[in-house]
Curated annotation (Swiss-Prot):
Gene name as annotated: nrdR
Source taxon at top rank: Bacteria
Residue ranges of domain ATP-cone in the record: 46-136
Protein name stated in the entry: Transcriptional repressor NrdR
Zinc finger regions, unnamed: 3-34
Organism: Corynebacterium efficiens (strain DSM 44549 / YS-314 / AJ 12310 / JCM 11189 / NBRC 100395)
Length: 156
């Protein structure tokens, strides 16, 4: 790590802390030449493999933007969308892989979105699962109701 003050190539770590829900490390460093102190943030890169074969860095903002469309006209706050995006990132990072398929991100969005707003969930699922008719919506609603009943029985 080069010192931002004197460009010397050696520094020592004084302090390290996990930040951003474990997805990054903040390190306080001291230059061994000029004793200047500076902070670095180290983050493991998570790449998204898109359907066309292109890879790009994971973006929470893209998750928020996609889910915001499904939530249009619904009473869902920006903070809720940001928390959902963080939850999705934590889910896909927990796979332990540095690369995740775009399809897996969509899958990771479904459950937290359903908990947040069922109408937004149906809108998102209709695109993600390529609904073609009202029957597809009806099947999904029946599935949601069954899962809701099962959850109530478990909490019982």
């Amino acid at each position: 790590m080069y010192c931002p003050f004197c460009q010397h190539g050696h520094s020592r770590v004084i302090d390290s802390r996990v930040i951003e829900a474990g997805s990054a490390i903040r390190r306080r460093r001291e230059c061994s030449q000029c004793q200047g102190r500076f902070t670095t943030i180290e983050k493991a890169v998570l790449l998204v493999l898109k359907r066309n074969g292109v890879t790009e860095p994971f973006s929470r903002e893209k998750v928020v933007t996609g889910v915001r469309r499904a939530c249009q006209g619904r009473d869902v706050s920006d903070d809720s969308l940001k928390r959902l995006a963080q939850q999705v990132e934590e889910t896909v990072r927990s796979s332990g892989s540095s690369q995740v398929r775009a399809n897996d991100i969509g899958l990771a969005i479904l459950d937290p979105l359903r908990e947040l707003d069922e109408v937004a969930y149906l809108r998102f699922a209709s695109v993600y699962k390529s609904f073609e008719s009202a029957d597809d919506f009806e099947k999904e609603i029946r599935l949601m109701r069954r899962q809701s009943r099962e959850k109530q029985v478990q909490q019982g």
